[in-house]
Amino acid sequence: MFYPDPFDVIIIGGGHAGTEAAMAAARMGQQTLLLTHNIDTLGQMSCNPAIGGIGKGHLVKEVDALGGLMAKAIDQAGIQFRILNASKGPAVRATRAQADRVLYKQAVRTALENQPNLMIFQQAVDDLIVENDRVVGAVTQMGLKFRAKAVVLTVGTFLDGKIHIGLDNYSGGRAGDPPSVPLARRLRELPLRVSRLKTGTPPRIDARTIDFSVLDQQHGDNPMPVFSFMGSADQHPRQVPCYVTHTNEKTHDVIRNNLDRSPMYAGVIEGIGPRYCPSIEDKVMRFADRNAHQIFLEPEGLTSNEIYPNGISTSLPFDVQMQIVRSMKGMENAKIVRPGYAIEYDFFDPRDLKPTLESKYIHGLFFAGQINGTTGYEEAAAQGLLAGLNAGRYSAEKEGWAPGRSQAYLGVLVDDLCTLGTKEPYRMFTSRAEYRLMLREDNADLRLTEVGREMGLVDDARWARFNEKLENIERERQRLRSTWVTPSTASVEEINTMLTAPLSREASGEDLLRRPEMTYAQLTSLSAFAPALDDAQAAEQVEIQVKYEGYIARQQDEIEKQQRNENTLLPATLDYRQVNGLSNEVIAKLNDHKPASIGQASRISGITPAAISILLVWLKKQGLLRRSA
């Protein structure tokens, strides 16, 4: 039977991608349905109990700047907050928070259940309704059919998921949850390229069986960082430390002696695992010169005794896992409460997607998260938001939107996936971005909130706060530009105590702030430049904008030069065999990838600068030279 009411957008899957997609579509005013196999697992952290990190924290801030959920949820659930790379420049500083799994899931569910235009329904999905290469709905396990104008697939590791512990394996979407086999079979019937990937998770340890007294503690930062631009440290629950232990030669001997029982090394697992989150077996074999690996013991929550040993992801048999755990300092009597495992699952080649994350072949069908070959909560959330907003725009018959590489890490992520594809789980790093000085955590709102407001993602409270911040920044910069001191100023001695070289000529507040030794806090502690802004976010922007003004201007020039090619559009229906002068290899690659722009084409492996020049000349001759706005 058909459900009586049609929807604008259906989201299939309630993980980090699905929840952001559902919230985004609903915020835009679209009637949205979130289908999940279990309402109690909405927003569940399937692996590590943490949000953020290098590159990942940047994505979380961007999701927040667009009105998303993840940053707000972790501010209510984070039990240890830190700024990574705090001693380095602002481009690579990143926020990371340990999470209480229960509080995080609770924050996500509360937000979903209170979001207007959003209905949640508990049923696994077995099929899509596709008519004339256009998705028009979904069919649940019990045969109930839902109609919609757009569908977003955010199914994580559930598509034909297979869990491995030692040489034993069984079907599962994750530990304790069934896989999605009928849907996987249905998707394999569509004209989409599909392959397998693998990820893994470590065993969980009973904290009561660990001797923490012999281990080093790792505390969070004080003052505590905040993730959301709308957040406050007052929202954070009680903070707790993590602990550090290490593997040793005994650990490594146990692993080497049991490799024949590893499903990876025995050839049982076909899927490729994440390069930047390798299993402990991989670490020991790939880094044979290392006699120890650092392991972080991370609490799973304030009311839980479970500890997540970050760094020993494994699919070795349970008896070997016990030996590995008990070989480490402080863990000699440790008990495992959940075994580690590896999981294989289907993913679909993201090169078959438009930058909006809509399928090139099935209209109205969007993909987000691990189904696109990524790994990580943050990467999933960012894709989910983008897919959700574009599904909403599609259902409203509006043009899709995707950020550029110079606009957001989300733009880098999507461009990498859609242009280059991936053969291993893709993780975001700051090193993947060419313009990372422009793509900082601290300015994510300045880059994206205005766009989010235009698309209906940003509510009135966030918009008012954003505009207040802009006004504070401009007012303070104007004040510092127009406030001057000279060597004869009465307070010059006070100023000179903070400078490496005495003041020798007239200088404005901005001139002094540009000096490496001067911070905004120091400058505004001087009587000539007091008082400081009460708005800490605006104050941070003032300091960064002034200190890095020259570098930022130079990078902006680079972006503008690159933008000409980036925005030159390529017809979606172009058969590159029509373009004289292109090699057979280039023709094959362009016809295979179908890039949306010259910029995207230039990043395809094997596409030479000469080929790009030929394309530009041909487009001009044919009267097809068009640039996007």
Swiss-Prot record:
Annotated signal peptide: none
Record-listed NAD(+) binding positions: 273-287
Key words of the record: Cytoplasm, FAD, Flavoprotein, NAD, tRNA processing
GO cellular component, one term: cytosol
Cofactor(s) named in the record: FAD
Family: Belongs to the MnmG family.
Subunit structure: Homodimer. Heterotetramer of two MnmE and two MnmG subunits.
Role noted for this protein: NAD-binding protein involved in the addition of a carboxymethylaminomethyl (cmnm) group at the wobble position (U34) of certain tRNAs, forming tRNA-cmnm(5)s(2)U34.
Protein name: tRNA uridine 5-carboxymethylaminomethyl modification enzyme MnmG
Source organism of this protein record: Cronobacter sakazakii (strain ATCC BAA-894) (Enterobacter sakazakii)
